[in-house]
Amino acid sequence: MSHLNIANLGEDFVAQWLQSTGWIILHRQFSCRWGEIDIIAQHTRNNQESILAFVEVKTRSPGNWDDGGRGAITLKKQAKIERTAKIFLAKYPDKAEYICRFDVAIVAYQGISQQDHAAIGEYKFQLQEYIPAAFDCLIY
């Protein structure tokens, strides 16, 4: 399976997890000329203010070289995500007053054997870490 397909499956896994914890998925793979945001999700707590999360998903196999994907969230990558988030908010001005944050989801995957009845498909995914407000950007 290609790297792109694995990444998409990791994003599917995180989107399902977010939905199971009360988040609404607004967009998947939102892109513009500046970059792409894997998942944009909204959550409202007890009829209070809504939170908008711009989620970067990093899906890695065991023994990877970049600390489970954490090493790939460089300052340059953060700036691209911030610019893309600004484009999203300009396109959807009704969301501009929401509390915004930038989250990172670290997902591990591994191939499964024929005897592993708990997994579906060729791979087993596990959310290693979900980091809310993993980095700060200034959105106006």
Swiss-Prot record:
Name the record gives this protein: UPF0102 protein alr1796
Similarity comment: Belongs to the UPF0102 family.
Signal sequence annotation: none
Organism: Nostoc sp. (strain PCC 7120 / SAG 25.82 / UTEX 2576)
UniProt-listed InterPro entries: Restrct_endonuc-II-like, tRNA_endonuc-like_dom_sf, UPF0102_YraN-like
MF annotations from Gene Ontology: nucleic acid binding
